[in-house]
Amino acid sequence: MKLGIVGLPNVGKSTLFNSLTKAGAESANYPFCTIDPNVGVVTVPDERLKLLGDFYHSKKVTPAVIEFVDIAGLVKGASKGEGLGNQFLANIREVDAIVHVVRCFEDSNVIHVDGSIDPIRDIETINLELIFSDLEILERRIAKVTKTARMDKEAAKELDFLQKVKTHLEDGKMAITMEMENEDEEAWMSTYNLLTWKLSLIHISEPTR
């Protein structure tokens, strides 16, 4: 599994990445410390592996791994090229699921790109950029399918579905909150690789040590 760590600049994404992977990626108190994505691979501890290996007399036991990708900070307007722009939305599109790091702590020594601490606003900022990016994907797909929809019943069905997804996103909702009505819809959705269709975990704090 490949997990992308995302969030606004300077919220602790690289710090979390280093904590998970022990990779030693640069982490500093200024926006866009990370430009190129950092990648780390972590094995998943599982006590059952040894038992299964012993039972089947396996010569080699290979644990599951998780690949973490520390992606540069997104800002308002990223889908239109602001900050470090679409390059990093593309990096998110390559992962299986999203870990969204949200700043909840107060510290005057740590810069916030929007000047104040507001976790709900920050979550909405990132979600909107993901939505805007997905809308561009949908609009391109709609333009393509429209060309064949009049002559192809399956294309016409997909076009109706695309319009439904587009309306859902335009209402400010993530694609993953949509209920698929049949197998065709599930199959179509899986081919679009929408950012808002990916599973997402919001990380807000770490225990004080």
Q: Predicted segment positions?
A:
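Residue-level detector of conserved catalytic or cofactor/ligand-binding positions
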Residues: I202-T208
